Amino acid sequence: MTLHAATSLRHVAALGLTGLAITMNTHAASERILFDFRALTNSPAWQIVNDDVMGGVSTSRFQILTNGGAVFSGVVSLENNGGFASVRSAPGLHDLTDCRCFVIRLRGDGRRYKFTARTETGFDAPLYQCAFETKRGEWEEHRLAFKDFVPTFRGRTLTGMPPLNPANVTSVGFLISDPQAGPFRLEIVSIRAARQPEKPREP
């Protein structure tokens, strides 16, 4: 191999690495990490809200594991007109104006869940929610567009309400409210916000 050829190959390799770095930085810049439970072993307490506030007997808990990840689990009961369990993060303003969707990385149990967001901290504040299905035992990434979130209050859809305002997100969480009694388990790796509702193509 000539000196000129070797130099050219090194130049091409350098350009390739530079391009890869630019691509990785671009992808990183297009997302904002809200919670990464792989690196987070301590966090302001997440709040459990179950149907016992309305006389139900469903139970749940939220655990941040020391070896990485978080688990939202429990038992849904339909007794006493109950049937839901939920958890939400501690209040804290997230300005997500430059984003268009939430990205959640998790492993479910085949049940249907809802990802929730609040833009106010009051007890009577509306709860914005977007449903997603899980596949039992499979790691999945769900991209939930802000425009698909529905304003609700105590399980009822609100009409005449503005869409989810990404500039004023105060907390996020998970809700299970399908009419199916029994245990549930959701393993969560991370919660992020992204500019693209569609997953970026691999370089």
Where would I find each of the regions flagged by the language model?
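Beta-rich carbohydrate-recognition modules and glycan-binding surfaces
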Residues: 22-203
